[in-house]
């Protein structure tokens, strides 16, 4: 599925859930050392103090390298688990800092999937595609009313527009990029 997503959306960023990765890393560590490894793991994802983008990702990558150096000899499988697709753990760092806590994990998506499964289980069998889409719409509509934590100010909208331009139209050598041609409004 990941390969198909890359084919269809080649410029998109894919975020791995940092919570699930933490669980996977800790599963490879003896219980008596898990609190130490867990604290070091979460230190990787502490705020970097850098603006969103490549500098912020570089700081987090340096922290991950320090984690690997610290625990590599004692827990090689845990370090290998962390380093597997590491760049996908840092995708959220390209977005506005106000969004980081909400988009670095997949809990809101999983909750929506769980609610859909629960409702389908109660119904038993859906008579057709239309009823399935109606149920899915109802679940997503209700869930979207409860999603909180992602504030959209004109500044964050501008950051997201700049990120979109970087992903869809990366600058070439000698091409001055630094301004956004679109007008940002409060309604955007």
Language-model-detected regions and their locations in the chain:
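Catalytic center-proximal scaffold of phosphoryl-transfer enzymes
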Residues: 1-188
């Amino acid at each position: 599925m990941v390969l198909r997503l890359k084919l269809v959306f080649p410029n998109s960023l894919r975020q791995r859930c940092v919570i699930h990765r933490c669980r996977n890393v800790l599963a490879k560590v003896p219980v008596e050392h898990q609190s130490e490894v867990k604290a070091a793991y979460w230190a990787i994802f502490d705020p970097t103090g850098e603006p969103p983008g490549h500098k912020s990702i570089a700081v987090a990558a340096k922290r991950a390298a320090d984690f690997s150096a610290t625990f590599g000899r004692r827990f090689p499988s845990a370090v290998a688990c962390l380093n597997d697709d590491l760049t996908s753990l840092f995708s959220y760092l390209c977005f506005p800092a106000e969004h980081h806590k909400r988009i670095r994990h997949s809990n809101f998506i999983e909750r929506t999937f769980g609610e859909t499964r629960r409702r389908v289980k109660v119904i038993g069998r859906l008579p057709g595609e239309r009823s399935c889409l109606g149920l899915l719409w109802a679940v997503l509509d209700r869930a979207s009313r409860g999603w909180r934590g992602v504030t959209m100010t004109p500044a964050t909208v501008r950051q997201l527009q700049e990120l979109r331009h970087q992903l869809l139209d990366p600058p070439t050598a000698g091409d001055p990029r630094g301004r956004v041609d679109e007008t940002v409004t409060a309604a955007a």
